[in-house]
Amino acid sequence: MSEKHPGPLVVEGKLADAERMKLESNYLRGTIAEDLNDGLTGGFKGDNFLLIRFHGMYQQDDRDIRAERAEQKLEPRHAMLLRCRLPGGVITTRQWQAIDKFAAENTIYGSIRLTNRQTFQFHGILKKNVKPVHQMLHSVGLDALATANDMNRNVLCTSNPYESELHAEAYEWAKKISEHLLPRTRAYAEIWLDQEKVATTDEEPILGQTYLPRKFKTTVVIPPQNDIDLHANDMNFVAVAENGKLVGFNLLVGGGLSIEHGNKKTYARTASEFGYLPLEHTLAVAEAVVTTQRDWGNRTDRKNAKTKYTLERVGVETFKAEVERRAGIKFEPIRPYEFTGRGDRIGWVKGIDNKWHLTLFIENGRILDYPGRPLKTGLLEIAKIHKGEFRITANQNLIIAGVPESQKAKIEKLARNHGLMNAVTSQRENSMACVSFPTCPLAMAEAERFLPTFVDKVDALMTHHGVSDEHIVLRVTGCPNGCGRAMLAEVGLVGKAPGRYNLHLGGNRIGTRIPRMFKENITEPEILASLDELIGRWVKEREAGEGFGDFTVRAGIIRPVLDPARDFWE
């Protein structure tokens, strides 16, 4: 994209303060251990507020009661979000029972939140329960290491591919990549698991003493499903199979969706194709991409620090050549691949060995016992009898995987009795939101709490126009950081202020095109009025099989984003 304007390999200038914090942290220890014992505050102070992110936690507070507590001269009700490391979203039923118990007994909200990065989060962990949550995870073979901040985050892997044999191989690679790129510091084990300090000096051969310039996200994807939304990620391994066996990967680098309102130096970007590599080079290439970004990423401006900006600054070919040099390989030409969809296949799907997979739609990924729909209890009951595993999907749903024919009826009965298989519209299945209020400190507008009733209204429009059995990929994100992946939707809403959103149009169903802003800072009635008109036109004027996003581009309603570094804001 940007070979015309190659810039410096390293950005000189005053380093961002986060770089000082990492350097002085003694490999991510800081004074977290001492801070844990400070009962005068429910939060972590100073650098520790940011350092705990490397340990998989964010400090939050309940924004619904923030003003009320301030009036009472009380500090905000601090509580932690904890995000588990769960490559490929695979979790055993024993592990599920442990996290269910912890959520019920030791969190403010009592829920498990499935995320669109294939893991789960606990919201509302008080400071006194922070150490116990890490110890509980460790006791069942899990951890929260490197699920936030400037590291390689949770590695995604296609959940329910059409060829299940490939899933086992791809999942193993997702785990290997995750383990290979983990930090080597013993800080996590010392602070949370009470393991002894070792006399040897810490070293970080891959990540370095100041870790990465910014967050880094990786996927393993099995076409034709793009359920993991590869273009939202820094590094993507697209599976290439021959005769049903995995033989290598196409590598795509430099995707990312977060922007800052009004900051023209920020933009969403799809990933660039680097080439094909045989399986045996996977870890060397993963390491080479990460270390190139480690050394060349912008450490002076965190808003321009992600891999997508490094690629645009130095040029795709320059970055690719450096990866080849470090990995000691030459990429082969990209092998053919195509995507046909990215939604989950809700309901039963037959896999190999006569085993079945049941994908359950979980609205917003929020697992809780609702009136008449005790979802959390239902999943616990299934976990008690299911001998296979659960898989969390990148669409915030849950798969009961590996069900033998003999257990199928029993598991389906439990699911139906607990409201886990209630019929929902295609539109609802293809709509998604991030958490946003009340817990996210960055939220500008509602997302998770807004989505269910908003989808009711979109469903009414779809019915009115005679397309109630069809869908538009709809995403709502509460702020421009973009966790809801609205920047890969056919209709994307990006929070601007309470009750107000920027409306983006022109993405496509398979998630390979960035949508452009259509209207700025508008209310729900204004959004619905626009959609009413546009859905009406789509139904009347579309070509056979043409999705809503493709139609808005072809009809000239919105110009496609072709080169985001230059035309995203036009």
Curated annotation (Swiss-Prot):
Catalytic activity: hydrogen sulfide + 3 NADP(+) + 3 H2O = sulfite + 3 NADPH + 4 H(+)
GO cellular component, one term: sulfite reductase complex (NADPH)
Coiled-coil parts of chain: none
GO biological process: cysteine biosynthetic process; hydrogen sulfide biosynthetic process; sulfate assimilation
Keywords assigned by UniProt, alphabetized: 4Fe-4S, Amino-acid biosynthesis, Cysteine biosynthesis, Heme, Iron, Iron-sulfur, Metal-binding, NADP, Oxidoreductase
InterPro entries linked: CysI (IPR011786), NiRdtase/SiRdtase_haem-b_fer (IPR005117), Nit/Sulf_reduc_fer-like_dom_sf (IPR036136), NO2/SO3_Rdtase_4Fe4S_dom (IPR006067), NO2/SO3_Rdtase_4Fe4S_prot (IPR045169), NO2/SO3_Rdtase_4Fe4S_sf (IPR045854), NO2/SO3_Rdtase_FeS/sirohaem_BS (IPR006066)
PROSITE patterns linked: NIR_SIR
Note accompanying the cofactor annotation: Binds 1 siroheme per subunit. Binds 1 [4Fe-4S] cluster per subunit.
HAMAP family: CysI (MF_01540)
Family note: Belongs to the nitrite and sulfite reductase 4Fe-4S domain family.
Subunit architecture: Alpha(8)-beta(8). The alpha component is a flavoprotein, the beta component is a hemoprotein.
Role: Component of the sulfite reductase complex that catalyzes the 6-electron reduction of sulfite to sulfide. This is one of several activities required for the biosynthesis of L-cysteine from sulfate.
The protein's name in its UniProt record: Sulfite reductase [NADPH] hemoprotein beta-component
Organism listed in the record: Citrobacter koseri (strain ATCC BAA-895 / CDC 4225-83 / SGSC4696)
